[in-house]
Structures are given as C-alpha cells and as structure tokens.
Amino acid sequence: MPNWNFLFDMLKIQSVSGDEESVSKFILESINQRKKNWIVTPEIYSGEKFHDCILLKFGNPTTAVFAHMDTIGFMVRYDNQLIPIGGPEIIPDVKLTGRDKFGEIRCSLLGDEEGIFHDFPRGIERGTRLSFEQNIRMDSEFIQAAYLDNRLGIFTALELCETLENCWVVFSTYEEHGGGSMPFLLKFIQETGPVKNALISDITWITDGVHHHEGVVISIRDKFIPRKKFLDRIINLAQKSGIPFQLEVEAHGGSDGREVQFSPYAIDWCFIGAPEDNVHTPDEKVSLKDLDSMIQMYQYLMKEL
C-alpha cells in the first residue's frame, strides 16, 4: 500500500531550486525510519559534502535511478518584482507562499510574461523564494496538487527501495533551473560503485499522443536523444512485463538525463515517468493508474536490468 501520508507531507514542503535543504532532511528522516523494512540496507551518502543531495547504494549496482528534489517557483527581486525559477506558468492572481526573516508570506502574483510582481503589503527580503500555494486533492482516479513534478518521482524511488538488491537511488538538486548537481553525483557514483545505466524517475506531460490512464511513459526522446540500443532493451522488457505503458516522442523538454548524456561517462539513460496535465501550475494532475504503473515498472525493470 503506497505511503500516501508521506507523499502529502512532502508536497507541503517548499524546495524551490537551490533551496532543497528542508525536503532533503525530510526524505533522509523517512529513509532512516523505513530502511529496516527493506530487503537490503543501503549505504547512505548525504550531508554538506553532497550539497543536500542523497545517494543510496544497494548491493553491487549496475543501474542508478535519479529523482530530483527541487521545484519551480519565483524569486523576489527589487521592490515588488518577481523572477521565475525554472519555468512556472504565469497565472495572474495565483497565490504564492514563502518566508523571509520578517515572517510568513502569502500574496498574489500580478502581471504577465512581460513582467511579474507580488502584492504583499510590505517589502519582501531580496532573494526570497516563493512557491505556488499548495492544495492537494485526490479521488479514486487522480491526484492533483502543485509540485507533483517531481514529488511523484521521489515517491516512486522510495517505494522502489523496499525491493531493491543492487542499485543506486539518487535524489538530486537544481534540475528545474538547468541542473548542476549531476556532474559531481555521477563522478562520485563512478568512483564508488560504477554503473552502466541510468533511469530518470520524473514526471512528463499529457500531449496529443500521451493520455491519462494509459500507463507510465517511456520517453524515446525529448530535446535529447538516448541511445536506441538501450531504449530497445527497456521497451522490450516493458512489453514482457504486461504493465501498461506509453511511448513518448517530443522535440522539447529535458531532465537529469541531459546531464548523464553530456557527462564524460558511458552511461545509457532513459526517462520513465507518469504523465501530468496542467504542467508547472498549482493544479498538476496525474492518474493514479499511471502512478501505479510507474511504480510497478521501476520494480520490474530493476529486477531485469
């Protein structure tokens, strides 16, 4: 049974790119509580040396699963100006929340793509990060909330930990704003327990070719193109699994897979994740069937790769 309370609690934690400390601490506490029930107890690497990233090494891995902890959001500039972090949708009057040294903040977003502002009655400290106000909704078919990208990727990776024997599970930072932690994470992995494969546990988009309730998405390409030989292997395994899945072919978008491909290491990679509607808004929406397919697919693939 999925740990929904953990997911709901995690969804309430702010972690705009560059400020992942709180969610990292929350995830690490959960790992330490849950690891006694896992088949294999992993070696845990975390702390200041890893800039809030977390690495779990199970057994003798040949594959690593990556899930980013950060979210999109906004940063306060001068006066009442805001600057996007990552690619949030600009929605006039949407509620934003955060905190500076003077206290809690709840305000509305004003403006459009040409310039965005907040309406908080006092000045907000420069550099303060603001997030969409959270409103979690779940029924028998869907979960809807801000930041399902990539809380559901983290959720899947931690569910996967219960049955892992040989794998790295890595929680990265900065992904929504261009990356930055992956180079040192990959270097550490290849020096400590080298891998040949990387799976990216993240959330993709509902499009004209990808739909709710039709299964987890295996991405053939986004802006970047993984190696066909590895993709064919993943797709063949997925077909044998009997787990519902969809194939994605897009010209845009990216993930931590980009940094795997651009690294100096010969590591194959593939993005596998549930699709969502209302991307980068407070109302991201994912099918529970697709989330279940995502968790099952990762569990299956990690036994076969």
Task: Mark where each language-model region is.
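N-terminal hydrophobic/helix-forming segments and targeting peptides
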Residues: 1-305
